[in-house]
Amino acid sequence: MSNISAKLVKELRERTGAGMMECKKALVAAAGDIEKAAEEMRISGQAKADKKASRVAAEGVIEVYAADGRAILLEINSETDFVARDETFKKFAQEAVKAAHAANAKTIEEVLAAKTSNGETVEEARKSLIAKIGENIQVRRVKTVEAETLGAYIHGSKIGVVAALEGGDEDLAKDVAMHVAAANPMVVSGDQVPADVVAKEKEIFTAQAKESGKPAEIIEKMIVGRIRKFLDEVALLGQDFVKDPAIKVEKLVKDKGAKVVNFIRLDVGEGIEKKEEDFAAEVMSQIKG
């Protein structure tokens, strides 16, 4: 059966998101049976997803969803920023984080098994998206946190932060989350900085201080002062608040009767070796699939 109506092709395209020619080819192979054609395209999509799984996906978005004292952050990667800006990709990411939150998912496996609003799993939606877009799409990281007060902040879809507080309100928690996105602290308080990191900094400061030629007791005071300054720079509570540098974050939360319990910050592509490509190459990769 080669006489396939345009209406049937259009319906299959709307259901699968695939191209017109691919839909017509599938309908011809299925003798006009749209259900069979859709199923064969899903199987084909699975094969395409498997083929693309080895390709580096270092672009993408961070999505955050917070409700009922629980927050979840997802990093979902694509191969190119071109796709990361695509509305279909963004919609998938938003559906995935909502589904993961509803399922109280804490691992990648649990995220992928979570059901989206249309009844399919995140994994099924991911593979369908790969077949449609033609890039490797990966749910790379999931982080969760529970607290009395939560504040979420996303910067340009590339940095996502959740601040967890005891006391205070959501506005305060959002301000803290925004600060974390901008200042990128290592820990909440100075006493949480790993001992080996402090030791390394002390070694560097000691060498620098000795070059000054000052007496030993002065050198010791210099080292203590520099270590204290270092801890303030890398610890959230010791940092100057980005919206009002005249006060420390510690004072900001204390004045509101709150305490910072934890924060989570995800940056798209952290730790992934990215392949440098120019825009023309990126567009060509889209055309070639």
From Swiss-Prot:
<comment type="similarity">
    <text>Belongs to the EF-Ts family.</text>
</comment>
<comment type="function">
    <text>Associates with the EF-Tu.GDP complex and induces the exchange of GDP to GTP. It remains bound to the aminoacyl-tRNA.EF-Tu.GTP complex up to the GTP hydrolysis stage on the ribosome.</text>
</comment>
<dbReference type="InterPro" id="IPR014039">
    <property type="entry name" value="Transl_elong_EFTs/EF1B_dimer"/>
</dbReference>
<feature type="region of interest" description="Involved in Mg(2+) ion dislocation from EF-Tu">
    <location>
        <begin position="80"/>
        <end position="83"/>
    </location>
</feature>
<dbReference type="GO" id="GO:0005737">
    <property type="term" value="C:cytoplasm"/>
</dbReference>
<dbReference type="Pfam" id="PF00889">
    <property type="entry name" value="EF_TS"/>
</dbReference>
<protein>
    <recommendedName>
        <fullName>Elongation factor Ts</fullName>
    </recommendedName>
</protein>
<dbReference type="InterPro" id="IPR009060">
    <property type="entry name" value="UBA-like_sf"/>
</dbReference>
<keyword id="KW-0963">Cytoplasm</keyword>
<dbReference type="GO" id="GO:0003746">
    <property type="term" value="F:translation elongation factor activity"/>
</dbReference>
<dbReference type="InterPro" id="IPR001816">
    <property type="entry name" value="Transl_elong_EFTs/EF1B"/>
</dbReference>
<dbReference type="InterPro" id="IPR018101">
    <property type="entry name" value="Transl_elong_Ts_CS"/>
</dbReference>
<keyword id="KW-0251">Elongation factor</keyword>
<keyword id="KW-0648">Protein biosynthesis</keyword>
<dbReference type="InterPro" id="IPR036402">
    <property type="entry name" value="EF-Ts_dimer_sf"/>
</dbReference>
